A protein has these predicted regions:
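Mitochondrial intermembrane space
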Residues: 22-133
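Positively charged n-region of N-terminal signal peptides that target proteins for export
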Residues: 1-5
Length: 133
């Protein structure tokens, strides 16, 4: 049984194609420059892509995630009903709670990504470009 599991995992790893990591478009190494690039992104989706490319994988990502939410939320928050806004807030809190009991800066990064991805998904669903489709 263990042998089959090891073989199956090995086969999946061999068949998986590695994803090409995007380079961070921000030439400066500072956190503020990365946050500014996210805030000034033309679209919410591009803001999330910049976060993904420029992420630290540690607690520094909390600032990047906040910048994504600052960029994305104006696209959809005014259009949400009260019930939809409560659902969005619950989703954001769920992201906080998901890794709250875990220690380590990596888990703060996971929380930041969860919240940023939630904001980007809501912007795609309820934002101005969503109605144009």
């Amino acid at each position: 049984m263990l042998c089959r599991t090891v073989m199956a995992v090995s086969a999946m790893l061999l068949l998986a194609t590695p994803l090409q990591a995007k380079d961070c478009p921000v030439q400066e190494f500072g956190l503020e420059a990365r946050e500014d690039a996210i805030r000034n992104a033309p679209t919410c989706r591009q803001a999330l892509e910049i976060m993904q490319a420029c992420a630290y994988g540690a607690s520094g990502d909390t600032g990047l995630g906040a910048a994504v939410r600052e960029r994305c939320e104006p696209d959809f928050l005014p259009k949400l009903s009260k019930a939809q806004k409560r659902a969005y807030d619950r989703e954001q809190k769920r992201c906080d709670q998901k890794y709250a009991r875990q220690s380590g800066t990596m888990y703060r990064s996971f929380t930041a990504f969860c919240q940023a991805q939630s904001a980007a998904a809501h912007a795609a669903r309820f934002g101005a470009t969503a109605k144009a489709r």
